[in-house]
Structures are given as C-alpha cells and as structure tokens.
C-alpha cells in the first residue's frame, strides 16, 4: 500500500474512531490516529514541497515553538499542540496533489462505503438506547442525542463527515442508493442540539443540490417545500428546544448577542481585551496554548477555549499564525472551487460552510470537520465537472 492510499484510508477512520473517544480505555484512540496521519502527511509533503509552502511550514514551526515558550504547563488541552499544524499539513497536501487525492478517493469507493455503513450501524442502533440521550440544563433542559459519544459536539462533526462522504460517493458513482445513508446523520443534526452543525449540514446539501439541478429555477422552486419541511422538523426536534433556549428575553443572563451565542461573545471580548495588552512580539507570534483558558478561568469557574478559530489562533499563534490560517483556507478554495469558476452561489455556500463553523463553533479543533472539508471540495469539483461535461455534449 503506497503512502497516498494509506493516508486516504487513515483519514476515513476518523468518524468511527471519534465515536469511541469518550470510552475510558479508548481516550487515546483519536490522538494516536492523528499522530499517524501527521507522520504520513509529513512524508508526502516534504518530498516535493513548493518553496512557498516550505516557507510557510517553517513559519508554522516558529510560531509553534514560540507558543510553547509562552505556555505555562500543564496544558488545559494537549490536543491543541496538534490541530493547527495538522490543518496546515492537510492544506499543503491537498493543494499540492489535488488530482492524486481525488483519484485515491475514487479508488476507495468500497472502503468509504464500509466506513459509512459501520458508522450508520453504530449510531443507528444507539438511537434506540436511552443512554444516548442527555438532559442539558444549559440548553433549556432539553433532551439531546449524543449517541455513544457522550457529547453533542463530538457526534455532530462525525455526522458532517458522513454526509460529506455519502454525497461524495453519489457524485463519484451516480448511485442513488448511497443517498439513503444521509437519514441517520440528519437525525443527528436535528437531535444533538448544535445549531451551527445543523446549519452547516443543510448548506452542504444545498451546495450539491444546486449543482445537481441543471435548470436553476427548479432549485429555487424546491427551496419552498424544503424550507417548510425543515421548519416543521426543527420545531419538533431538539434543535427547536435549543433555539428556544437561546432566544433573548428580558430575563436572560447575558445580553442579546451573548444569549444567542451561548455566552461566546463575552469570552471573545475578554480574550481580545487581554490579547491587545500583550507586547508586540506576543501579538505577532502568539501568547501560548493556555492563554484563552487562563483568561476565562480568571473570571469564571471553568476554563474555556475561544469557540472561534480567528480568536483562538490569534491568541495562540499571533497575527502571523492567523494570516497563515486564512491563506491556507484561501489556497484550498482556489484549488478546488475558484479556479473551476463555479457558480457564485456554490462559492458562497462553501465559504459559509467553513466560516460559520470557524466563527461560532471552531473548525480547526474538530478533526472530522477539518478532514471532511477538503473531501467535500473534491466531490463538488468532480460533480461540477461531470455536470458541465453533460451540458456541453
């Protein structure tokens, strides 16, 4: 098995491995997989790296070392050591070998199908288990589905990756049977209570649906029944409970935006306030991996990360680290979307899929969200090329 195929197969394990991450004896499982993937990525990218990316990777090492120097140990979250570098390596790989990456996903149809089936069986069975549901008092005491993960924000990224893989399978094979596998992850979106992931999941479906509709007026007409259907489903699901719990009233603890964002805007304000008090070198290269946790710990009973990619990376790796992150996302979008001259609506939807997650939840710290984003871009590109080819015949 060559390194590209090995990388493809390792990446596809994340949605299944993540399900078991909360098990006491398996807490290490995702971290071990992530380290293996990083080793393979380093092997693949360092061999034939463009000078531009070599300079960027060197800078990433510099900001990482500086962040470690600024960190007061022990770490609140040891995973933070890996996320940022992993994302940059992933970006370098996909932008350097776009055709190679696409070909290996095509060749692994059966493997992808087995991963989707295994995830669907595990999560599907858990739907009927009372232990898969939790009462969250912070979210209005609603009953939320977490499957065997124990956490809605651990389950939701796996749902997103499965939806991406299912749509990717359909785009690459044109076999409609794969679309039935969307049902369980959509149930997960509706019942886990994450408004961000529910919205992102719907945007992913809309992006593929827009390309599918050859006559675009059909797409816009179809939005009417789809909006009505989703409205009914949301109002009668845990998502509706979460929306009701985060609706601002005169009795709300936070202000309007604080209530809507579950207090995130309060953390953001504190994080930025203390970041701008740092010296210019720390602002350029970052304040360390614990900076955001230490700030919230000082003012609240628990330490929290920023829940925002831009602020988190700014605090950890400074202006330079944030600039590299934004450039890496642009590089991916340019390679798979912008250079293909895709319709403006598709470009907008893809941008919002990344931006909403990065802004209101965090994108680069959820492995399944990170891993499935380039896969979604590959599937959209291949499907768009296929539809354009048919239209030109």
Give the residues covered by each predicted segment.
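A juxtamembrane structural motif centered on a specific transmembrane helix
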Residues: 1-6, 45-49, 173, 338-342, ...
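Hydrophobic transmembrane alpha-helices and their immediate junctions
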Residues: 45-51, 176, 217-219, 223, ...
């Amino acid at each position: 098995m060559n390194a590209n195929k090995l990388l493809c197969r390792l990446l596809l394990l994340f949605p299944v491995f993540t399900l078991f991450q909360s098990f006491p004896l398996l807490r290490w499982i995702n971290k071990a997989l992530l380290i293996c993937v990083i080793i393979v990525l380093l092997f693949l990218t360092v061999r034939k790296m463009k000078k531009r990316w070599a300079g960027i990777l060197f800078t990433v090492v510099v900001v990482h070392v500086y962040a470690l120097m600024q960190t007061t140990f022990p770490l609140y979250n040891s995973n933070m050591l890996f996320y940022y570098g992993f994302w940059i390596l992933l970006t370098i790989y996909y932008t350097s070998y776009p055709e190679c990456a696409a070909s290996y996903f095509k060749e692994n149809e059966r493997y992808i199908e087995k991963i989707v089936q295994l995830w669907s069986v595990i999560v599907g069975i858990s739907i009927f288990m009372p232990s898969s549901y939790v009462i969250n008092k912070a979210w209005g005491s609603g009953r939320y589905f977490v499957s065997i993960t124990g956490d809605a924000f651990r389950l939701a990224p796996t749902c997103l990756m499965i939806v991406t893989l299912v749509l990717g399978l359909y785009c690459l094979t044109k076999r409609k049977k794969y679309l039935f596998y969307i049902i369980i992850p959509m149930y997960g979106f509706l019942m886990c209570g994450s408004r961000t992931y529910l919205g992102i999941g719907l945007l992913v479906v809309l992006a593929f649906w827009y390309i599918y509709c050859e006559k675009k007026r059909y797409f816009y007409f179809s939005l009417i029944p789809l909006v009505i259907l989703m409205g009914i489903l949301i109002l009668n699901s845990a998502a509706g409970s979460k929306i009701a719990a985060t609706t601002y009233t005169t009795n709300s603890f936070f202000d309007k935006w604080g209530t809507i964002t579950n207090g995130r805007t309060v953390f953001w304000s504190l994080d930025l306030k203390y970041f701008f008090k740092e010296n210019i070198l720390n602002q350029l290269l970052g304040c360390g991996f614990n900076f955001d946790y230490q700030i919230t710990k000082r003012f609240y009973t628990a330490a929290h990360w920023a829940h925002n990619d831009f602020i988190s990376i700014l605090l950890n790796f400074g202006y330079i680290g944030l600039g590299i992150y934004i450039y890496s996302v642009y590089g991916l979008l340019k390679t798979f979307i912008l250079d293909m001259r895709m319709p403006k609506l598709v470009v907008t939807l893809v941008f919002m899929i990344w931006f909403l997650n990065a802004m209101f939840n965090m994108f680069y710290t959820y492995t399944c969200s990170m891993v499935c984003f380039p896969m979604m871009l590959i599937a959209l590109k291949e499907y768009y090329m296929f539809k354009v080819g048919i239209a030109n015949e």
